[in-house]
Amino acid sequence: MIELRDVRHRYGRRVVLDLPAFALPAGARVAIVGHNGAGKSTLLRLLALLEAPTEGAVLFEGHAVAGRAIGRARRRVTLVEQRPILLRGTVRDNLAYGLAARGVRGAARERAVAGAAERLGVVPLLGRGRAELSDGEVQRVAVARALAAGPDVLLLDEPASSADRAAVLALHDALERERAERGLTVCLASHQLEDAYRWSDDIRTLADGRLSPVTPENLFRVSLPADATEGVKHARVGRTEIAVLTDRTGHAILAVPPTDILVSAAPLATSARNQLSGHVARVARIRPGAGVHVTADVGVELTAMVTEEAVRELALVPGRPVVYTFKASAVRVF
């Protein structure tokens, strides 16, 4: 659908993107993971044809775009930025705006607005103005506005940065439905690994201006010895704690939010890949629960969220032996 060839993009003398080849196929779900400032937003703007690369070419459906062709291609690609701007008027007016620009009017426009609002859960917001919306609601409205216009390609910049869990699930369901029904192509940029796993089949890392496929080494910047048989390295991506385990068969990545870790005081009974033994390093109480920092025997520090009752019942004090059990869904094997 969209392809970058021999692209180098600069701001002043600084090269922010160096991409010999990158393709976003029709119907794909691609995630770009990188730290803040890595160039994710710039990459999305190139894919949206809102910026031209300093060097190289952007192809749409196999053809270089220029002149009037840029406008035609742009109408089929929609970018929802991290801090979207809503127009004056109500949420309903915003959802209808893109349709009017495409010549969709009357009953057809009302059906499209109602459908997009229902899918993103913004029906109760249709009569509100921008000043009456939270940041998370603004993001949902912006995505609903994009989907109402029926793009072939949807580009999302940090789509869950201001959303609660219910909104994230609604967005995920809406995108899956659009993809199943009409082959929507989705590319999202995020520094949250859990977003990438939830919404994509193809995860790329962006660092030093270059895209790479996901591996433990290039995602978490850890160096693992070639002869390693067992071991753990630690890293953090956004709010997610990461343990990278190695064994004789390869690498297992545990992408584990603190709420997906169970802590027990029982001795480690098995050598399951989703368990680590350790000792409590410190307890930091954060209402309504407690954040329990456990330093595992193998040297990786992870954070679990448990209740105050569990802290008392398990006698979770520094030095207490504990076992970490990760939810099976949190274990990703490469």
Put a short name on every predicted segment.
Residues 239-284, 308-334:
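Glycine/charge-rich catalytic "coupling/switch" loops of P-loop NTPases
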Residues 154-158:
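Catalytic Walker B motif of ABC-type/P-loop ATPase nucleotide-binding domains
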Residues 129-133, 137:
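Conserved ABC ATPase signature
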Residues 48:
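Helix-to-loop junction immediately C-terminal to a conserved catalytic motif
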Residues 33-35:
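The feature captures the beta-strand-to-loop junction immediately N-terminal to the Walker
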